From Swiss-Prot:
PANTHER family: PROTEIN UNC-50 HOMOLOG. It comes from the Eukaryota. Residues 76-88, 162-175, 223-235 are lumenal. It is a multi-pass membrane protein. GO terms for cellular component: endoplasmic reticulum; endoplasmic reticulum membrane; Golgi membrane. It comes from Schizosaccharomyces pombe (strain 972 / ATCC 24843) (Fission yeast). This is Protein GMH1 homolog.
Length: 235
């Protein structure tokens, strides 16, 4: 069996996963996200790649998503089919499929528009953009949004779905914060790569989010419509 296959199987062993590091990453994505990416820069010097060494972050994140899905189903789709449907959608669509799409999109954007044109950089294997690193960046960026929209929002729904302006403002602002923080963390993730330029362009969606948020305050309750899309009924 080749070395790459042996390494692949090693990465799938729970005993080989660094869950302590995964917890550290998750905590610092809230309080000091640049520390997470500084540690990635140091890791690059040790193992010569930017992507994570194992799947501990993804495994831990997936477990949290499953628990969150169980709670959502308990409140809004309390049937065996409802539990399976909610877990499947949140884990394999929201996290898996959307993650692959976002990572691939940013991978091609970075390769097409953000790569430095220096011939030395382009020819060096030390400065190759890794798709799995793009997926890691998405996971890092999505985690705070997950906490805001899949955990905190669930318990705030009785308040933020009421028919008054304060509830409208609170609920829509929750989504604004989640989207802006996702974009900011994504920007940090690509900013640390020495072979990319003009990474501030990745912050361009943030003004658009503010415009959409301001327009939504005219009467479009985002949390209420999201629940309706997910579960076919208003909160």
């Amino acid at each position: 069996m080749s070395r790459s296959f042996r390494n692949g199987f090693r990465l799938l062993k729970l005993s080989q996963m660094d869950f302590e590091r995964a917890w550290w990453d998750m905590a610092n994505l809230f309080r000091a996200p640049r520390r997470v990416y500084r540690s990635i820069t140091l890791r690059k010097q040790n193992i010569n790649r930017y992507g994570r060494e194992d799947f501990s972050f993804i495994v831990l994140f997936s477990c949290m998503i499953v628990i969150s899905a169980l709670l959502w189903a308990l409140f809004y789709m309390n049937t065996p089919k409802g539990y399976v449907t909610t877990i499947t959608f949140m884990l394999f669509v929201d996290f898996g499929a959307v993650g692959v799409i976002m990572a691939t999109m940013y991978y091609f954007i970075a390769k097409r528009f953000l790569m430095k044109s220096n011939d030395t950089i382009l020819s060096s294997t030390d400065y190759q953009l890794e798709w799995n690193y793009c997926f890691d960046v998405h996971c890092n960026s999505f985690f705070p949004s997950f906490v805001l929209l899949y955990v905190i929002q669930l318990f705030l729904l009785p308040v933020i779905t009421r028919d008054n302006f304060i509830s409208l403002f609170m609920g829509n602002t929750l989504y604004l914060v989640a989207l802006c923080y996702y974009s900011y963390l994504t920007f940090i993730g690509y900013q640390i790569l020495p072979f990319l330029k003009n990474t501030h362009a990745l912050l361009l969606p943030i003004p658009m989010f503010f415009i959409m948020w301001a327009l939504s305050l005219l009467g479009f309750n985002v949390p209420k419509h999201v629940v309706d899309v997910y579960f076919g009924k208003s909160a």
